[in-house]
Amino acid sequence: MASSVMSSAAVATRGNGAQASMVAPFTGLKSTASFPVSRKQNLDITSIASNGGRVSCMQVWPPINMKKYETLSYLPDLSDEQLLSEIEYLLKNGWVPCLEFETEHGFVYRENHKSPGYYDGRYWTMWKLPMFGCTDATQVLAEVQEAKKAYPQAWVRIIGFDNVRQVQCISFIAYKPEGY
């Protein structure tokens, strides 16, 4: 019985020569003595990674007589061909088109909710029902024309909903009243 028991020290010292040379021993951290102690200070602020110094300033959106509406509102009004292209993109992604209109405030303002963020406190009125199963962009454009005829002083926007994820994926102004 005593002959079958080995000491743990004997097992630990018995190793293969190939295994011992596979892992290099830890030598510790490098000494900082090789770095120069006195360095020339760099006073050039353009090399510092910060938010100041070398910043390209952009003008902000002028708030007087230039209201911000929705996506693409900084562009000129979209033509019918451009609207068709946007609607085809919406349909190609499998989103459900829906039209909404607003007769008083087609721009961002705070009425029902005062904190900033995605929700801006506006409620738009839905034009008819969402166009489930619509595959033709001209049908959506015809509804835009009908909404313009019924409410010529209203903003009309097109929204694309993803009915699987249950989120709004796209929204843009299709019509602005005269003078805006």
Swiss-Prot record:
Q: Localized where?
A: Plastid, Chloroplast; Cell junction, Plasmodesma
Q: Its gene? A: RBCS3
Family recorded in the similarity comment: Belongs to the RuBisCO small chain family.
Lineage of the source organism?
Eukaryota, Viridiplantae, Streptophyta, Embryophyta, Tracheophyta
Q: Where is the transit peptide?
A: 1-56
What role does this protein play? Answer: RuBisCO catalyzes two reactions: the carboxylation of D-ribulose 1,5-bisphosphate, the primary event in carbon dioxide fixation, as well as the oxidative fragmentation of the pentose substrate. Both reactions occur simultaneously and in competition at the same active site. Although the small subunit is not catalytic it is essential for maximal activity. Involved in antiviral defenses.
Which GO BP annotation is one of this protein's? defense response to virus
Miscellaneous information on this protein:
The basic functional RuBisCO is composed of a large chain homodimer in a 'head-to-tail' conformation. In form I RuBisCO this homodimer is arranged in a barrel-like tetramer with the small subunits forming a tetrameric 'cap' on each end of the 'barrel'.
Q: Which cysteines are joined by disulfide bonds?
A: none
UniProt cross-references to Gene3D superfamilies, sorted A to Z: Ribulose bisphosphate carboxylase, small subunit
Protein name in the entry: Ribulose bisphosphate carboxylase small subunit, chloroplastic 3
Top-level division of the source organism's lineage: Eukaryota
Cross-referenced Pfam families, in alphabetical order? RbcS, RuBisCO_small
| InterPro entries according to UniProt | RuBisCO_ssu (IPR024681), RuBisCO_ssu_dom (IPR000894), RuBisCO_ssu_N (IPR024680), RuBisCO_ssu_sf (IPR036385)
